[in-house]
Amino acid sequence: MKDRTVNINNFIGVYDNYILPQECDKAIKLYEDQNKFNNTVNRIGSESASILDKQDQQFFAGSSNLNIWWEELEPMMLNFDMALQHYLKNTGAKEAFDNKLHYTSLKIQKTLPTEGYHVWHIEHQKGYDNEARAFVFSIYLNNIEEGGETEFLHFSKRIKPKTGRIVIWPAAFPYVHRGNPPLSGEKYILTSWMMLR
């Protein structure tokens, strides 16, 4: 494995080489296998989203399929948790939140060229379990040569998709961001939130 690198700037944490490429390949395969059986969700239909706002397909980890996720993605999530613990410790969030953070549902998203979540937004709202979102994280599952960045409005920052790259940031203002459309190929990410009890 290459040397792990960490860059935390303005509480936006970028972690490289924590997750192996083969772990990312397993996540993509998990998504594609579920898509064959129509187990993925189109956001235009499921969220009544405008095609100009959100356009991608998602596969959620829920109570009915959690075993499949854990069997396939356990090494990835254990490596992610190492990055998360580093982030929480080095930003002061671990003390501030006094261990009241917990995971919520995971999802894998596939975005085709020119699609994506184009609208500037923040994640600070109640999630599906009616608990407040504290942090957002994304794991890029493949390289994108052109486009597909996570862009932060108030920090003039774009994070390029790179296989295995982890990005963690606070869910609230001023972390206004968007997912720029991938231009050179399909984009896969695993994404979710850390919730506050």
Would you name each region that the model predicts?
Residues 1-166, 174-197:
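Fe(II)/2-oxoglutarate oxygenase catalytic core
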